[in-house]
């Protein structure tokens, strides 16, 4: 039977391929870091060739189920996709206060933690920033996107209840036909526990007065099952005026009616009140012990609250078709100061949306499965941006970024997307997956201010006009078709090879279409499209499990933000890489696992930014090498300790490739002790060597090198009581 060990069961992993760094990006210790990280994976592979350590207690991959491919549980062995999984056991060990702490151990994933609960995401991509950059990733909970199509937010992962997740699934590369707009570079899906599944309470204390409580309370009333998930945290922050309070609550239910119809769903509420610390400015300022703790933007804040409700209705027709209907509702309100922009304007945005996911499945025979469905969604959204004080800085910036209101608009949007997928399996070891999705998104925009690039009173800014430009009322429609092809061949019971050709797309986000700048009067944007081809090898031998994937992606109509915070349209970028992962049980007590990523992300068309032609340059915030390695020691059945190495390679911090960040290495130590059957004690020590590093490095034309400093050495002590 095809078996993978637990670390690879819980994630289908990989590593990236790319070109060599430029001469200025090839210092000796960076090459050493890359070699050491690759060696961690190679050591597991080489060691596993010794059968003396082979173990029979590794879970079968057939036992692992995922929902991120077809929206219903299916065995991982039946899915031809690059899916990585964080299991409940791993999530409990990590016990993240920010989802980055968990997700970044998966292949292809590189989430930058900015400040507080903020983040910028990378999945087989650069770390993308800008108002619509979030459109490159589909972020979901229970398979339902966290935000409406066209209304994403770069930080929206804090909307998910990941702290109480049963598992987190990550699809690398364009997702299946079941998912459309935003599933360009990948998808993160937070899967919550089944209703009624167990009860426990966790209390945690940490540095600087950090307090966190987490609870899962299950009720099994026979036919009806309920669960209440709760999470709350209060943290002061290690930088000045950078604390936050966050609360999350989710109610889940499940029942089966007399006619056999199954209902499961829930209601989720989140609230975040955050004091935000901005970038520290100046070359290597993150290394300065005093400066790294300061906050240049003490006025900055972020208030976010969301409500989501859904019900999944599943039944089987007499004709043999399985049907799943999932109506849902979401509401999101966000109020924050844009400390990263000149003048630090305040933005208020909100949207209400309702939709329906419809999918049907039919086993045509033992070897063929046909699936089809449709997604429908309607959204009402709005955005206001205003600036309370005059802009400081250069005379040009002060003249062109006015005090007062910049934008005020409403957008109504609709989405409709039919899809079909066909799967066939042959006895000779081959199987094929064919899919197709068509998606149409329409925006109806209403401007509530004066049209054009004037101040809010109609007066003209000197030096060529105001930075912000408001288009007249208009409607925009985008339609896209995305074909999918996957072929897999079982080389033996324990090894298989996979080949995939897919297309991903996203419509421009509302903020990209209607927050115009400078001379733009109409955002002449097309949908972003990416064509992906990948080849993977996956399997196990004895105590080893492994996966290797090479990929090549070509993206057109990309929208990027340059160092002046100006959108550059119609960009062409290329993304190629290698993802490697391995996990090896050295003996009954020790396990070594790791994921290594090597990638090259480049601009592929002529575009002048800062006087430099970007063609051939690395995309900014795109490390060519990064990954993690974990060594777990389990001396007894009740005690487990994990030492984690997080390695980040160097990368350019601007599109012009004139500034860069050296990268870093960070060690984390996590220990979990089952004191009794019901009581567990955990101690997590992060940044074990107190390394001074940057969570994110950036370069801005308004201030030069700037950084979000990484947090210093810190420890969290937790008690968990199961009942």
List the predicted regions and their residue ranges:
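C-terminal beta-signal and adjacent terminal beta-strands/loops
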Residues: 63, 551, 592, 647-654, ...
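Extracytoplasmic beta-strand/coil segments of soluble accessory domains associated
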Residues: 100-144
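Short strand-turn segments of transmembrane beta-barrel domains in outer membranes
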Residues: 136, 175, 187, 191-219, ...
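Short acidic/polar hinge/loop motifs at secondary-structure boundaries
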Residues: 144-172, 191-192
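Transmembrane beta-barrel wall of Gram-negative outer-membrane proteins
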Residues: 207-234, 239-277, 298-322, 364, ...
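Membrane-embedded beta-barrel scaffold of Gram-negative outer-membrane proteins
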Residues: 214, 223-225, 320-338, 490, ...
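Gram-negative outer-membrane beta-barrel transporters
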Residues: 366, 428, 432, 440, ...
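Surface-exposed extracellular loop regions of Gram-negative outer-membrane beta-barrel proteins
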Residues: 380-399, 442-467, 475, 488-489, ...
